[in-house]
Amino acid sequence: MVILAVNNSPMRFGDRSGGVSRRRVILTFPEVIPAKERDPQLLEKIAGELAVIVRHLMQRFTRLDDARALLQAQQSSEEALEIKRSADPLVDFCGDLTPLSTPTGLFIGNANIRPMNPRRYLYHAYLSFMEARGHQHPMSLTAFGQAVPQTLKEYEIELLKRKTKNGIQTSLELSENCEADWLPRCDG
């Protein structure tokens, strides 16, 4: 099954299981065609040529692995990742995380820990990120905890965790650009 969605801005998907992101291929067409140059019959022309287009694709990709390799390369391209970052705040937030080889990084934390400490707790960092970027509806801790491991796969990062007496510790730390970009400052 092929679903083609054409839009001027990146589409947002509520699915956090990874089902859509594993299958979605983003192709950008950034060039805007001036209104006076647009073909009002374009859709009908494409529909009329669909059989030829499909036949051409079938001839071009006689080996399914060739087509799959090209689609997967586009799926994980920098261009596609930038579009996903602009469409999904969690993908954008995860782009500001750096993986560690062991779970010695940020603790997950929760919303009740006061004062907020985004340099120590992953969930606090996420809340600070959302506030700094003007996003009005952050995820609950439970939804965040379920979505982060799947979202990190966009960056080919596996989340490692361990239980400690201070809470659950992750294999993530904040990247250096967070300090200047969105972390709260302590300019006394």
What is each PLM-predicted segment?
Residues 1-188:
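Feature primarily recognizes SF3-like P-loop helicase cores of small DNA viruses
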